[in-house]
Amino acid sequence: MKELSTIQKREKLNTVERIGSEGPGGAYHEYVIKSNSMDSQGNYDVYETIKFQKGARKEEKSQHGVIDSDLLEIVRDRLKSFQAGPFSSRENACALTHVEEALMWMNRRVEDRIERNVLGTNTK
């Protein structure tokens, strides 16, 4: 496991670690999110293990899992909810704009791959 170097350095609630080695395309495919505070037995609570898609979706031996846009859609939904509630802020609005922009670019890649009939394959 390797702890990620995150943008937020102070007052972090959680630690994110990546597990394993690089897969196809050079990315890692499993992450753990755990608490930064120990319980009474000296253990850290693990909140979630996230397993990403590993390999092309049409490959028989690929590991099916979460894709990057799934996580961004969750963050987008949360930021939209904060903006509609009592925690609306300029910072959240800017973050929402950039998350939506990231999703737009990721979708543009998907659409391009669909048009070229290579979505779900290891063809570049």
Swiss-Prot record:
<comment type="similarity">
    <text>Belongs to the Tad1 family.</text>
</comment>
<dbReference type="Pfam" id="PF24729">
    <property type="entry name" value="Acb2_Tad1_hairpin"/>
</dbReference>
<feature type="binding site">
    <location>
        <position position="113"/>
    </location>
    <ligand>
        <name>2'cADPR</name>
    </ligand>
</feature>
<feature type="binding site">
    <location>
        <position position="92"/>
    </location>
    <ligand>
        <name>2'cADPR</name>
    </ligand>
</feature>
<feature type="binding site">
    <location>
        <position position="29"/>
    </location>
    <ligand>
        <name>2'cADPR</name>
    </ligand>
</feature>
<feature type="binding site">
    <location>
        <position position="122"/>
    </location>
    <ligand>
        <name>2'cADPR</name>
    </ligand>
</feature>
<dbReference type="InterPro" id="IPR056098">
    <property type="entry name" value="Acb2/Tad1_hairpin"/>
</dbReference>
<feature type="binding site">
    <location>
        <position position="109"/>
    </location>
    <ligand>
        <name>2'cADPR</name>
    </ligand>
</feature>
<feature type="binding site">
    <location>
        <position position="55"/>
    </location>
    <ligand>
        <name>2'cADPR</name>
    </ligand>
</feature>
<feature type="binding site">
    <location>
        <position position="120"/>
    </location>
    <ligand>
        <name>2'cADPR</name>
    </ligand>
</feature>
<comment type="function">
    <text>Blocks activity of the Thoeris antiviral defense system (ThsA and ThsB). Binds 2 molecules of 2'cADPR (2' cyclic ADP-D-ribose) per dimer, sequestering them from ThsA; sequestration prevents the signal (probably 3'cADPR in vivo rather than 2'cADPR) from activating the Thoeris antiviral defense system.</text>
</comment>
<feature type="binding site">
    <location>
        <position position="53"/>
    </location>
    <ligand>
        <name>2'cADPR</name>
    </ligand>
</feature>
<feature type="binding site">
    <location>
        <position position="82"/>
    </location>
    <ligand>
        <name>2'cADPR</name>
    </ligand>
</feature>
<dbReference type="GO" id="GO:0000166">
    <property type="term" value="F:nucleotide binding"/>
</dbReference>
<protein>
    <recommendedName>
        <fullName>Thoeris anti-defense 1</fullName>
    </recommendedName>
</protein>
<keyword id="KW-0547">Nucleotide-binding</keyword>
<comment type="subunit">
    <text>Homodimer, the subunits are arranged head-to-tail.</text>
</comment>
<feature type="binding site">
    <location>
        <position position="78"/>
    </location>
    <ligand>
        <name>2'cADPR</name>
    </ligand>
</feature>
<feature type="binding site">
    <location>
        <position position="87"/>
    </location>
    <ligand>
        <name>2'cADPR</name>
    </ligand>
</feature>
<feature type="binding site">
    <location>
        <position position="57"/>
    </location>
    <ligand>
        <name>2'cADPR</name>
    </ligand>
</feature>
